[in-house]
Swiss-Prot record:
NCBIfam families: meth_trns_rumB, rumA. It is an enzyme of class 2 (transferase). GO terms for biological process: rRNA base methylation. S-adenosyl-L-methionine binds at residues 212, 241, 262, 307. The lineage of its organism: Bacteria, Pseudomonadati, Pseudomonadota, Gammaproteobacteria, Enterobacterales. It holds the Pfam family tRNA_U5-meth_tr. One of its GO terms (molecular function) is 4 iron, 4 sulfur cluster binding. Keywords: 4Fe-4S, Iron, Iron-sulfur, Metal-binding, Methyltransferase, rRNA processing, S-adenosyl-L-methionine, Transferase. It comes from Yersinia pseudotuberculosis serotype IB (strain PB1/+). InterPro entries: 23SrRNA_MeTrfase_RlmC, MeTrfase_TrmA_AS, MeTrfase_TrmA_CS, SAM-dependent_MTases_sf, U5_MeTrfase_fam. [4Fe-4S] cluster binds at residues 3, 11, 14, 87. This is 23S rRNA (uracil(747)-C(5))-methyltransferase RlmC. Belongs to the class I-like SAM-binding methyltransferase superfamily. RNA M5U methyltransferase family. RlmC subfamily. Gene3D superfamilies: 2.40.50.1070, Vaccinia Virus protein VP39. Its EC number is 2.1.1.189.
Length: 376
């Protein structure tokens, strides 16, 4: 993959771009195998990968420059703006959208936030595309509500220029820190969920819910989880840290008792919408802390699926799972190092199979799916 900004030394987000892609995959696999070297693994499966470019469904653009000539991209470590509108990770459909958005910023008078001076209003633009129907979700991250009326007044022009814009919102982030978004989200369209579909499973993305950024590889990850679970004829399961419900909704059959837990109420609203559309009657989702929920339960399902943030599931939940001893633990991780630490705490389990999913080409990051089975 060629990137002009990388070649010019302006962007180093893809820190492995100089490394041939087969070597990237081999290095990631070696890293994963070294982390699990102290454990017997019954089956290692070949890494799953997708496209090397144009795979991202989401752009997080810092807005800088002037209101008349806004720049979208990132700030270099020396504080100068780097234009990322032509970033090769984005689908080709994004660049013309960015062109329209620059014009809109000027028309609406949305002054870009100046980090050095701590002045201005528009901090970020967050753009997400559905691979299911091409609809877009756009979030304006503002320092305050000062320019909100101007933004709303100018929206009809933007919607006319970009009819694929289905979900629009404003997020208020008043803090002068490198924080992407604030807690307050103001919906600006009636529709507030972007429909997505992986493997015939309807999923929904709301403004403040997490969703994978590499749809083709994410679809493979969910399909693999479903296959592994179905092979063991599981009738009851928990989906902890469930997000919008992607894993649980893939794995649950009509008779499966599924409980999905996620701290984000936005994500839970998406999961419930999907479950209703699928007609699943034995499924429930709740906006709770996953560890608090699990450790308060006296009954354990046959399988516990965990998909934690980078910190892993931690000692408390590992100790609880070891004590309650579900037959299977399906662990999906975006940080294999914390996953390996957690597995070391689950001494009553052996690793049945492991597979790497390269969700983040040209970086050292990857996802991994691991099936743990209770030792007989």
């Amino acid at each position: 993959m060629h990137c002009a900004q990388y070649t010019a030394g302006r962007c180093r987000s893809c820190q492995w771009l100089d490394k041939p892609y087969p070597q990237q995959l081999a290095d990631k696999q070696h890293h994963l195998e070294s982390l699990l070297a102290g454990h017997a693994v019954t089956q290692w499966l070949a890494p799953v990968f997708g496209r090397e470019s144009t795979f991202r469904n989401k752009a997080k653009m810092v807005v800088s420059g002037s209101v008349e000539r806004p720049l979208l991209g990132m700030l270099h470590r020396d504080g100068t703006p780097v234009d990322l509108c032509a970033c090769p990770l984005y689908p080709p459909s994004f660049e013309p959208v960015f062109t329209v958005l620059k014009t809109f910023i000027a028309r609406a008078g949305l002054t870009p936030y100046n980090v050095a001076r701590k002045r201005g209003e528009l901090k970020f633009l967050l753009l997400t595309e559905s691979t299911y129907n091409g609809e877009l979700m756009l979030r304006f991250v503002l320092r305050s509500e000062t320019k909100l009326a101007q933004l709303i007044a100018a929206l009809p022009w933007l919607q006319q220029q970009l009819p694929q814009l289905a979900v629009i919102s404003a997020n208020i982030q008043p803090v002068h820190m490198a924080i992407l978004e604030g807690e307050r989200e103001i919906p600006l369209t009636e529709q507030q969920a972007l429909p997505e579909r992986f493997n015939q499973v309807p999923l929904y993305i709301r403004p403040q819910s997490f969703f994978q950024t590499n749809p083709p590889v994410a679809a493979s990850l969910y399909a693999t989880a479903r296959q592994w679970v179905q092979e063991h004829e599981v009738h009851s399961m928990w989906d902890l840290f469930c997000g919008v419900g992607g894993f649980g909704l893939h794995c649950a059959g009509p008779e499966t008792q599924l409980t999905g837990i996620e701290i984000s109420a936005e994500a839970i609203a998406c999961a419930r919408q999907s479950a209703e559309q699928l007609g699943l009657k034995n499924v429930s989702f709740a906006a709770l802390d996953s560890t608090r929920f699990a450790t308060a339960e006296a009954q354990i399902p046959e399988l516990v699926l965990v998909n934690p943030p980078r910190r892993g599931i931690g000692r408390e939940l590992c100790d609880y799972l070891s004590q309650m001893a579900p037959k299977f633990i399906l662990y999906s991780s975006c940080n294999a190092e914390t996953m390996a630490k957690d597995i070391s705490l689950l001494a009553g389990y052996h690793i049945e199979r492991v597979q790497l999913f390269d969700m983040f080409p040209h970086t050292s990051h990857y996802e991994v799916l691991t099936l743990l089975a209770l030792r007989r």
